[in-house]
Amino acid sequence: MKSFFVVALLVAAAAAAPANPDADAVIVRYDADQGDPQHYSYSVETSNGIAFSEEGALKNVGSENEANSVRGSYAYVGPDGVTYSVVYIADENGFQPQGAHLPVAA
């Protein structure tokens, strides 16, 4: 009889567990442009507050210094309810993110 109550309590606890709101997230906007072989851009937004956009281009085409240059941003709502945003550049100098919540290099 005790085991029945323990099992019943476990089942009730599992049924009462909060659902993951991100599990039901859907893409609400998607845009992409890849028509030019030396340039691309795309952006995505989801129903749970995630947003991402990026554009990239090949610079110094045909030269010894040819390199990819990428600019983008992303944002998401953290578990604390705060929206975190990051803007970044990625090029021959590496990945360079900036955001209010990120430390600044000296």
Swiss-Prot record:
Give any Gene Ontology cellular component: chitin-based extracellular matrix
Gene name of this polypeptide = CP14.6
Record flagged with keyword Cytoplasm: no
Any single Pfam family the record assigns to this protein: Chitin_bind_4
Coiled coil regions, renumbered to chain: none
Residue span of the signal peptide, if any? 1-16
Chitin-binding type R&R domain location is 37-106
Q: Which UniProt keywords apply?
A: Cuticle, Signal
Q: In the record, what lineage is assigned to the organism producing the protein?
A: Eukaryota, Metazoa, Ecdysozoa, Arthropoda, Hexapoda
Per its record, how is this protein called by name? Cuticle protein CP14.6
What does the UniProt record say this protein does? Component of the cuticle of tobacco hornworm.
Protein species of origin: Manduca sexta
Which GO molecular function annotations are given, in alphabetical order?
A: structural constituent of chitin-based larval cuticle
